[in-house]
């Protein structure tokens, strides 16, 4: 079952979820009067609050209801659409095309030609080979694609035997003072799993499970985002300060605090760049660049966000439609003339670029969830909705009431329910109904 068919079977009015492109996207859209900016901002903030509280239905469908919109394609604000799409990905595990957004940058024709002629090697093997030569590995993500977080867990598993035992995550909500941050991370280790207060993106069950399983492996968590950035005055200055502050915090809290340990750093796309990003004018140094300078360590930098099926930072060329043919069955690293190839936003700014296989659905769920150690399990019949739509959530029975679900699926009364993908162990269930 393809993504569009999955959403159609669930009765949702969504925009197309095919490859990203700069060309106009044809889709059925009901014209609606656009809300005021104040109304949009209020709905956006409420959606964030609902997601942090685990109210996924309110954060997604409720967002549309507050704006008096019948379907997501009526959203004209790209940031509000991204917020809606992020919450939906927490329930479906797949990203959604944003029709309110144009291409962010142009890809030089030479890069497209190189991509068409590229070869590929298995990603984990190449990452492990190169990770032996350094003490720091930096892996990025597309914030709207949970697939990236599942691959991050694969990388964490593969690197652990090499001595990698510190996991620094940009999304972790820490503290400005180092002592307070250390205490907060110790509490996280004691819990063994993330709570909603752990950070903004941990409402995604896949991200929360990546952290849970990494802690179980013995990784020590580190948070390092300390700057509340004000982009209103000068965005480039603000971004540069944020990148430097991140690198300084990582130097103190990871590199210096654990001098004999190796470190895996998990970041948003831009921060992995070791050189200013040419596609954006090259005017701002990124965290990886600063950390390389201050630590004296040349990190292995890996981009998996740029070749996502629906990248957050959108090129004017559908790069994934070319690259996915290089990775029919497993995640691969691109090569050209015997050297790693990088294209798109981070071309020339990272060491490796990963492309993942095209989405395959099994019982309505992405097959890559199996790589997280999940077992397919039909939804108990007693939990299926008699009418309307219902979010069916699975929690580890031992987790508290404020835990993040280990899995969840959206089901409708008039269609087959996707199966749950569950870890081993006792499970308790919860439901959220769409009014």
Where are these regions (language model features)?
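Compositional signal for N-terminal targeting/processing segments
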Residues: 19-435
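Bacterial N-terminal signal peptides
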Residues: 8-16
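Sec-dependent signal peptide recognition
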Residues: 2-8
């Amino acid at each position: 079952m393809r993504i569009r068919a999955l959403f159609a079977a669930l009765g949702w009015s969504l925009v197309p979820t095919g490859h990203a492109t700069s060309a106009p996207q044809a889709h059925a859209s009901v014209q609606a009067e656009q809300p005021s900016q104040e109304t949009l901002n209020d709905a956006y903030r409420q959606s964030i609050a609902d997601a942090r509280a685990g109210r996924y239905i309110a954060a997604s469908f409720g967002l549309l209801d507050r704006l008096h919109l019948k379907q997501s394609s009526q959203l004209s604000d790209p940031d509000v659409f991204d917020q809606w799409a992020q919450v939906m990905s927490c329930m479906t595990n797949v990203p959604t095309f944003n029709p309110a957004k144009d291409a962010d940058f142009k890809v030089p024709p030479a890069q497209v030609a190189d991509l068409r002629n590229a070869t590929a090697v298995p990603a984990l093997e190449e990452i492990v080979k190169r990770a032996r030569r350094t003490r720091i590995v930096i892996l990025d993500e597309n914030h709207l694609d949970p697939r990236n977080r599942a691959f991050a867990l694969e990388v964490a598993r593969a690197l652990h035997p090499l001595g990698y035992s510190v996991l620094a995550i940009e999304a972790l909500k820490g503290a400005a003072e180092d002592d307070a941050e250390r205490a907060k991370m110790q509490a996280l280790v004691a819990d063994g799993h993330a709570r909603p207060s752990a950070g903004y993106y941990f409402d995604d069950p896949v991200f929360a499970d990546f952290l849970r399983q990494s802690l179980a492996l013995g990784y020590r968590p580190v948070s390092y985002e300390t700057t509340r950035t004000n982009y209103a005055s000068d965005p480039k200055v603000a971004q540069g300060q944020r990148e430097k502050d991140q690198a300084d915090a990582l130097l103190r809290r990871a590199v210096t605090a654990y001098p004999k340990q190796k470190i895996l750093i998990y970041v948003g796309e831009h921060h992995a760049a070791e050189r200013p990003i040419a596609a954006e004018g090259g005017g701002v140094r990124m965290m990886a660049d600063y950390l390389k300078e201050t630590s004296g360590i040349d990190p292995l930098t890996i981009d998996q966000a740029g070749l996502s099926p629906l990248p957050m930072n959108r090129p004017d060329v559908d790069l994934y439609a070319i690259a996915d043919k290089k990775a029919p069955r497993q995640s691969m690293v691109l090569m050209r003339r015997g050297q790693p190839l990088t294209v798109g936003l981070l071309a020339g700014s990272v060491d490796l670029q990963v492309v993942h296989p095209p989405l395959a659905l099994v019982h309505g769920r992405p097959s890559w969830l199996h790589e997280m150690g999940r077992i397919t399990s039909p939804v108990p019949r007693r939990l299926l909705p008699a009418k309307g739509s219902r979010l069916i959530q699975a929690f580890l029975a031992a987790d508290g009431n404020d835990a993040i679900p280990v899995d969840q699926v959206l089901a409708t009364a008039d269609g087959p329910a996707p199966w749950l993908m569950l870890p081993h162990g006792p499970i308790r269930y919860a439901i959220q109904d769409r009014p």
